[in-house]
Amino acid sequence: MSDYVIIGAGGHAGVILDLLIARRENVLFLTDADPARHGSQLRGVSVTGSDDRLTGLDPTTVNIALGIGASGTDLPARLTTRRAIADDLRNRGYRLPSLIHPAATVSDGAVLDDGAQVMAGAIVQTGARIGHDVVVNTRAAVDHDCDIGDGAQIAPGATLGGNVQVGCDVWIGLGASVIQGVSIGNGAVIAAGAVVIDDIPAGARVAGVPAKDIH
């Protein structure tokens, strides 16, 4: 059992809290930038204030779990901001271990970088690399030899075939499918339900079956 503090107290933080409880970790408290959440609780764990509550904690004994998700407009910018928060915490000496829900399936031949989060029901196959601060969400599937760039998020139910290359800060939406061997550039957004059969350039926004640019 390890001690954790969760940064954020919204919906994604609740999922991370469930993950840590399932792993029988000890969650000390949550922080949040929104004062309206201070003094509230999630599953009996207190939201005690903003990130300044970390002051005085020993970063060699307390781990950090990033409970900040991404939603709404300008998703790549939100993902970049999320990754910057994680990098700032690391620069201050805190550890953000990779987290795997006990109900996820992750091959021993896969590599998870610090801060990666794999949720319940997700599958990560052999040879895959999951970058720093990536979220592989509920029931998402990442097949063999994929490479997922730092900060990317793979939404619930999305499926990636083998050898897919995903850049940094990419959003792959709910239930999207990406066929084998495709490359997706940094900051691209794949809409929910899209079927990607061709390479996607950096910064593109695509939707549909097959996926087409919607700029």
Question: What does each of the following model-derived ranges do?
Answer:
Residues 98-214:
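Structural signal for interior beta-strand "rungs" in well-ordered beta-sheet cores
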Residues 38-101:
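Phosphate-bearing ligand-interacting subdomains
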Residues 11-12, 80, 111, 195:
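Short alpha-helical
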Residues 16-17, 75-77, 200:
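Short glycine-/acidic-enriched loop or helix-start segments at secondary-structure transitions
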Residues 1-58:
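Hydrophobic, well-ordered beta-alpha structural blocks that scaffold small-molecule cofactor pockets
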Residues 18, 87, 194:
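Active-site phosphate/pyrophosphate- and oxyanion-stabilizing loops and adjacent acidic/basic residues
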Residues 9, 32-33, 69, 101, ...:
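Cofactor-binding loop segments of dinucleotide-utilizing enzymes, especially the Rossmann-like FAD-
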Residues 28, 62-63, 168:
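Conserved acidic residues
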